[in-house]
Amino acid sequence: MSGRAAASATLGGPSRRPRGRPPGSVAGQGAATRERIIESAVELFAAKGFHGTSVAEIGTHADVQPGALYYHIRSKHELLWEILRRYTEHALQGAEAITTADLNPVDKLRELIGFHVRIIAEHRQAVSIQVRDGDSLTGTRAAELQVLRDKVQDCWQRVLDDGYQAGCFRSADRAVVNGLLGMVNMLYLWYRPERGDTVEAIAEQFCAMALDGLVR
C-alpha cells in the first residue's frame, strides 16, 4: 500500500455525504425557513388580503430569495391552506377534548366557549383570513377544510344535543349552535388587548349570555 493510500485508509480519506435526506441541521434550517414563510404569509394576508398579496412580497417579508422560495412552498394557495388547516385543526382538537371530557353538558358548553374565545384571541389573523379569504381555496383543499370545520361544529352540536336530552338546555336547534359560534367568531373584529380587553372577562360574559338563554 502506498503512503498516500495508507494515510487515506488511516484517516478515513475524503468523506462524501451520502445521498438522500439532508443532515438534521440542514433539514432543521429548511423547516425554520418554511415556518418563517408561513408566518409572513399570515401577516400579509391578514393586512392586505390573499388576492392583494404577491408571492414576491411574502418572500421579501420572510427574507427568502425568490429562487429559493419555491423550494419551500408550491404556491400561494398552499400557504393559504396551511394557515387555515393549522388553525382549524387546533380548534377541532380542543373541541373534541372538551366534548369527550367527564363533564356535564353545561360545564362542557362553558369550556367550549372559553376555549374558542382563547384561540380566536390568539389567532385573530388566521380567523380574519378564514372569514375574508377562505373561499379562495377550491377543489380538494376547500373540501378538506370544510370537513374540519364541520367537525368543529359537530362537537358543539353534540354538547347541546346531550344537554337538551338531559333536560339542561331549552333548545339544541342548529340555529343556536350557529348563533353561538357566530358570536364567538366575530371576536376577531373587535378584540383589542391593548384597550384592556381580557380573554377571561370576555369568555365569562359570553358564557353568561349563552347560559342565561339556554339553561332551564
Question: How does the language model describe each region?
Answer:
Residues 89-92, 140-166, 174-178:
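Amphipathic alpha-helical packing segments from all-alpha helical-bundle domains
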Residues 128-131, 172:
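Short, hydrophobic secondary-structure boundary micro-motifs
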